[in-house]
Swiss-Prot record:
The lineage of its organism: Bacteria, Pseudomonadati, Pseudomonadota, Gammaproteobacteria, Alteromonadales. SUPFAM superfamilies: P-loop containing nucleoside triphosphate hydrolases. GTPase that plays an essential role in the late steps of ribosome biogenesis. It comes from Pseudoalteromonas translucida (strain TAC 125). This is GTPase Der. Residues 375-459 form the KH-like domain. Belongs to the TRAFAC class TrmE-Era-EngA-EngB-Septin-like GTPase superfamily. EngA (Der) GTPase family. PROSITE patterns: G_ENGA. GTP 1 binds at residues 9-16, 56-60, 118-121.
Length: 487
């Protein structure tokens, strides 16, 4: 297990900035106002060859109400999980009542805790930070997270005890590790072709605000991992959560809700939307959550379009299905059939994230979609299916000539890409292209993922070439012309 370092403190003391600095990413949203971070956010960092996990948390100040109470609970859970707690304070503001309350809580925990005074650039750090010794948590460590000052010294002083413990543990188990390495090397050659299959499946849960994405995430995990509150825009960042189900690894991505562009004016919401779109591009399977009571909206269709253009596999979950009468359910199903007819390959589930109804069957469709997207298909199989499709329904005539499909092969996967070579293939009507796509989908039993077919037309080998006449041919032409003139 990698050691865990939790970053805690009041709002707006620089926890997310330090998180980004330690993980060398820009995963955590950063803005100059309090309360931006809400859920626990995990990242992996490396110092001097030693890897560790960093947890970014929401700010706590003791005056929480509403959704802030949920944020504080997430921060307290992070403290319980951590091996080391970095308690961040603001060197410019000085010690506050909230700092004292957090320190009182930390002293009761059996954790290695270090006080980190941030924002020390441009001030006399020693004099400004002297009052923090009243917190009775030991030495005060000075840093400027936004500029990266003092970070290396902080890691040296805080990680050194933990590194010593890990080194002793590594020495105790080194002999056993050598045997395991030998066994791994023997099996690695045989299992190398399964490397892709062994990667965790990234599942992004997307949808409009307040449709139940975080509730569904917590239901799948069986714990209150992300904040759930009856208010649109509760989730602000994309939260990556590893999990295991039936001995298979997944990474759940809980994302912020996406509204229509004209309604998005807040800067933080704009960044949240960008994070959601990045999560769609980063994942393997997209789980679109739709509110049954609100019905399918144009914004849902926009999200679907972005997911399909990104080539992601797709599963649709209609949430809040419980409590609806049969008439309303039939009306909703008719609307879904009408508006989602263009993605008939995607599995549709009717669920209740709050009560767990139908949630267990989602992963059957997720696995099916992922396996379809990453399926390897031989060239012989693709060509045979192409020939069968032509035999059942010939390509149409274009300018009096029959379009000829000559050859097919795989052009990639995730999503499946099929390349078809032939004559006049660029002139094929869209109806025949859809026929080929559906024929391949049915023959290969591909569900849950789009299929992309690329048509390539053979170049004319004589295009642009000039017919060169030899000297003897020129003499014959002149003699023939002279003979015709004499006649």
């Amino acid at each position: 297990m990698l050691p865990v370092i939790a970053l805690v403190g009041r709002p707006n003391v620089g926890k997310s900035t330090l998180f980004n600095r330690l993980t060398r990413t820009r995963d955590a949203l950063v803005a100059d106002f309090p309360g931006l971070t809400r859920d626990r956010k995990y990242g992996q960092a490396n110092y001097d060859g030693y890897e560790f996990i960093v947890v970014d948390t929401g700010g706590i100040d003791g005056s929480e109400e509403g959704i802030e109470i949920e944020m504080a609970d997430q921060s307290l859970l992070a403290i319980e999980e951590a091996d080391i707690v970095l308690f961040l304070v603001d060197a410019r503001v000085g010690m506050t009542v909230a700092d004292q309350a957090i320190a009182n809580h930390l002293r009761k925990q059996e954790k290695k805790c270090f006080v980190v005074a941030n924002k020390t650039d441009g001030i006399d750090a020693d004099s400004n930070c002297a009052e923090f010794y009243q917190l009775s948590l030991g030495e005060i460590h000075h840093i400027a997270a936004s500029h990266g000052r003092g970070i290396t010294l902080l890691l040296e002083q805080t990680l050194q005890p933990l590194i010593a413990e890990l080194a002793a543990l590594d020495e105790d188990v080194s002999n056993d590790d050598e045997e395991l390495i030998d066994l791994y090397q023997e099996d690695s050659e045989d299992d190398s072709h399964q490397a892709f299959a062994d990667k965790p499946v990234k599942l992004a849960i997307i949808g409009r605000p307040n449709v139940g994405k975080s509730t569904l995430t917590n239901r799948i995990l069986g714990e209150e991992r992300v904040i759930v509150y009856d208010m649109p825009g509760t989730t602000r960042d994309s939260i990556y959560i590893p999990m295991t189900r039936n001995d298979k690894e997944y990474i759940l991505i809980d994302t912020a809700g996406v509204r229509k562009r004209k309604k998005v004016s807040d800067v933080v919401e704009k960044f949240s939307v960008i994070k959601t779109l990045q999560a769609i591009e980063d994942c393997n399977v997209v789980l679109l959550v739709v509110d049954a009571r609100a019905g399918i909206s144009d914004q849902d269709l926009s999200l679907l379009g972005f997911a399909l253009n990104s080539g992601r596999s797709l599963v649709i979950a209609v949430n809040k299905w419980d409590g609806l009468d049969d008439y309303v359910k039939d009306r909703i199903k008719s609307e879904l059939d009408r508006r989602l007819g263009f993605i008939d390959f995607a599995r549709l589930h009717f669920i209740s994230a709050l009560h767990g109804t139908g949630v267990g069957h989602l992963f059957e469709s997720v696995d099916e979609a992922y396996e379809s997207a990453t399926k390897r298909i031989s060239t012989a199989m693709l060509r045979r299916i192409m020939d069968m499709a032509q035999a059942d329904h010939q390509p149409p005539l274009v300018r009096g000539r029959r379009v000829k499909l000559k050859y097919a092969h795989a052009g990639g996967y995730n999503p499946p890409r099929i390349v078809i070579h032939g004559n006049q293939v660029h002139d094929l009507p869209d109806s025949y292209k859809r026929y080929l796509m559906n024929y391949y989908r049915k023959a290969l039993k591909i569900m849950g993922t789009p299929i992309k077919i690329e048509f390539r037309e053979g170049d004319n080998p004589f295009a642009g070439r000039v017919n060169k006449i030899t000297l003897s041919q020129k003499r014959k032409i002149r003699a023939f012309s002279k003979e015709n003139r004499n006649k």
